[in-house]
Amino acid sequence: MRRGRLTEGGIFHVYNRGADKREIFRDSDDYLRFIHALYEFNDEDPVGNMTYGFAKNPTRISMVDFRGVPSLKPKHPEKLLVDVLAFTLMSNHFHLLLKQRKEDGVMKFMQKIGAGYALYFNEKNKRSGVLFQGRFKAVEVTNNEHLLHLPYYIHTNPLDLNTDGVDEIKFLDSYRWSSHMDYCGWRNFPSVTQREFLLEFFDGEKNYRKSIAKWVKERSKNLRKIRDVALEEFAIFFFVITFGSQLLLSVD
């Protein structure tokens, strides 16, 4: 099995889910905690205390109130491990689109996320054992078609919920646990993501809004397209990240 490295400056679709497909986000506090972790752990400096907030109230975020518009200041670009381009959280899994800024930045960032959030979740729920289903997976974006579709794919993931009879765009506009609202220009979690790259790619917030509405109308067709692209990419760029190594796997 050959060893590989995640390309510095590369863009990666990162995802993981709960062990045995169990819920990893049980309530709003869990979603908020993970989203704050996306901000807090995106730093080359070590995090002093991964269990912050347990002493007073283990079910609430003590450092920032994400229930309103967050007042967190954007971090200095030189300190970032990755650019968080897009994200969506579902009850039992998550999708991230990351651009690596530092050597091993994706691995270090996901180590912090995985360890920190699992520690919080286990402490809060008085449980032990693994939370995630193995190591996180990362697929490198190697062509413009992949890059064009992945943000839509990630942001429309909540439509996999039972949305029969619901206006799909309105549903996405009201789904808070993603970066979709911020790309539309509505302040949701603006300090968490670095959106300039994709907004330039999509030619601004208004055009993003129009283009995702068009993408949703042909979602079934577009999903087949993105899965075909992903399968092609998997054969070459399917990485399993471990805490000490990065293994390049081939998929038949």
Tell where the protein language model's regions lie, with residue ranges.
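Short catalytic/metal-binding and nucleic-acid-binding patches
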Residues: 1-190, 199-252
